[in-house]
């Protein structure tokens, strides 16, 4: 991140916006290309493109609820997004890994929030499976960035914990 305070934490927010745009563009491409549950084999026996709508949360949690979950999960995403923006704003310049992690989670959360509020469901298009016997639930770029961001967040916590222990010695 640049040392200039003129732009502050803007680069991290721009990363979040870039993730949001990439997520939205890919979802639009697959919605325009595939019909529901159609599969295009990418890596035979392991990876397909597909189109699925998820009205629930991760792994279709509460997808069969009466519709209230749309606004419940949207409210959670809004609260989480506000917390992440505030957290990003309070970071010190040297906390680059943490900033990238938070920006990725924020971008992904905003991508799925858009779907949930505007469309009433989240658009998923990535399908990982093992020879059509075992299937991981379909997901999208937003989910991918949320996951990578969470992993980076955990790595940053371990790194920070190690640094704190070394400083104490």
Curated annotation (Swiss-Prot):
It comes from the Bacteria. The active site is at 124, 143. Pathway: Protein modification; lipoprotein biosynthesis (signal peptide cleavage). GO terms for cellular component: plasma membrane. One of its GO terms (molecular function) is aspartic-type endopeptidase activity. It catalyses: Release of signal peptides from bacterial membrane prolipoproteins. Hydrolyzes -Xaa-Yaa-Zaa-|-(S,diacylglyceryl)Cys-, in which Xaa is hydrophobic (preferably Leu), and Yaa (Ala or Ser) and Zaa (Gly or Ala) have small, neutral side chains. The keyword Chloroplast does not apply. Pfam families: Peptidase_A8 (PF01252). It is an enzyme of class 3 (hydrolase). It is a multi-pass membrane protein. The chain crosses the membrane at residues 1-21, 68-88, 94-114, 135-155. Its EC number is 3.4.23.36. InterPro entries: Peptidase_A8. One of its GO terms (biological process) is proteolysis. It is found in: Cell inner membrane. Keywords: Aspartyl protease, Cell inner membrane, Cell membrane, Hydrolase, Membrane, Protease, Transmembrane, Transmembrane helix. This protein specifically catalyzes the removal of signal peptides from prolipoproteins. Belongs to the peptidase A8 family. This is Lipoprotein signal peptidase. It comes from Ectopseudomonas mendocina (strain ymp).
